[in-house]
Regions:
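A short, highly charged nucleic-acid-interacting micro-segment common to nuclease
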Residues: 233-247
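Hydrophobic/aromatic-rich core segments of domains that either
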Residues: 245-315
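Short, charged/polar, Gly/Pro-enriched secondary-structure boundary elements
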Residues: 78-81, 163-165, 286-290
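Low-complexity, Gly/Ser/Thr/Pro-rich intrinsically disordered linker/tail segments
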Residues: 33, 75-90, 302-366
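Alpha-helix capping and helix-loop boundary segments enriched in small/acidic/polar residues
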Residues: 168, 238-242, 271
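Intrinsically disordered, low-complexity N-terminal segments that are enriched in acidic
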Residues: 1-156
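Secondary-structure boundary elements
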Residues: 161-236, 363
Length: 366
């Protein structure tokens, strides 16, 4: 590599390639100032640096210059490429961390660390409703105050159990969803708009709310749960128990198996704003509807007050960042519409092996 006009340019090139040693010749500034200039020209390099040292040789009598033999230690957890580092000038969009339901780890160089923390808090609901099994963010930050005013933030994720085990349980849940639909439908072929009710009816009748898991979360919201099962689709679909997260993911698994667009929503209940509550948005015939399977679980029947509801009705009991989710304006396919359809056509489905328990629950509660 040839000598660059400016020593900081040669240093930048060496650091991009993660070279452990570099020689800087004919320098008129201290090695610290050269590092400062390099990090000012390419702020992303701060994410690579662990430490540095330099031996020097003084040259010249009238105009003193230095030759530096620089050694550089790089962070073991540094990104593999400089292109994987994001620079934040105050306008970083935290929602880019979550793409297609998969959380993306990120190394961020920023002068706005306080804003970063605020932005991560603001999208916590999106994280919880997009990524099954994620408990929260894990952020590690460091600075080199003598070299840069920037902070390096490495953003990763806490999972409620090891990711390999999580994937295993998710695979079992997907298989269980197939089995559940067979037990509900038999050989009958029902319209898509009926299936959200059948999934809702199944979950609310066959599963129980795990009060112990809820009490643990209520007492210590920041710690990892001792029992992750109620937080996953695996809980309701296989062990038939869960809290709101588990029921929402289970409902989504059933909708995925039925090829119906469905997502989770993280917010809270108006009656208890301290704890996250998770439910679903389901899309039927181009319109979104809210479905809260947890709310439907009652000892004396199936409660349909939060089944296939628009935003305007859901606001009475639930709170969520509405701007972060699709607007639910659907009105047509509410419970009354589905009930009328099943009253007229249900016997045909029963003749094909459909399970009467889920098509016609003994007790419906408004």
């Amino acid at each position: 590599m040839g000598q660059s006009t400016h020593p900081e340019d040669l240093l930048i090139s060496a650091m991009i390639d993660k070279e452990p040693e570099v020689r800087l010749e004919h320098c008129f500034a201290s090695i610290q100032d050269i590092f400062k200039r390099a990090l000012n020209k390419d702020r992303r390099l701060l994410a690579f640096l662990s430490s540095y040292g330099a031996r020097y040789m003084k040259k010249g009598l009238i105009q003193v210059a230095y030759d530096y033999d620089v050694t550089i230690q790089y962070r073991e957890q540094a990104p593999s490429s400089i292109d994987d580092v994001v620079v934040d000038d105050g306008d970083w969009d935290a929602s880019t961390l979550i793409k297609k339901g998969t959380p993306r780890e990120l190394t961020l160089v920023t002068s706005y660390y306080d804003r970063v923390s605020e932005k991560l808090s603001e999208i916590m609901c999106i994280l919880l409703s997009s990524c099954e099994g994620v408990h929260g963010f894990d952020t590690v930050c460091f600075v080199f105050e003598n070299l840069s005013s920037d902070t390096v933030c490495t953003i990763s994720y806490d999972y409620i159990l090891p990711q390999q085990k999580l994937r295993q349980l998710q695979g079992q849940s997907a298989f269980a969803a197939k089995t559940v639909w067979k037990s509900i439908l038999g050989k009958s072929k029902v319209p898509q708009f009926v299936k959200p009710f059948l999934a809702f009816s199944y979950l609310t009748q066959e599963c129980c709310f795990d009060q112990r898991a809820y009490d643990e979360m209520e007492n210590d919201r920041s710690s990892q749960p001792t029992d992750p099962v109620p937080y996953l689709a695996y809980g309701p679909l296989i062990e038939r128990r869960g809290i709101s997260a588990g029921f929402a993911w289970a409902f989504k698994a059933l909708m995925d198996e039925a090829n119906i667009e469905c997502s989770c929503v993280a917010g809270c209940l108006r009656e208890d704003t301290k704890i996250y509550h998770i439910w679903n948005l389901v899309k039927i015939d181009g319109q979104f509807y809210h479905v809260d399977p947890t709310w439907g679980i009652k000892e004396n029947g199936v409660c349909i007050s939060t089944f296939m509801q628009p935003d305007s009705m859901m606001r009475g009991t639930h709170l969520w960042y509405e701007e972060k989710y699709p607007a639910a304006k659907g009105l047509r396919f509410d419970y009354d519409y589905i009930e009328d359809f099943l009253a007229e056509n249900g016997n045909e489905f029963l003749d094909d092996g459909a399970n009467e328990t889920y098509f016609f629950p003994d007790e419906i509660i408004d």
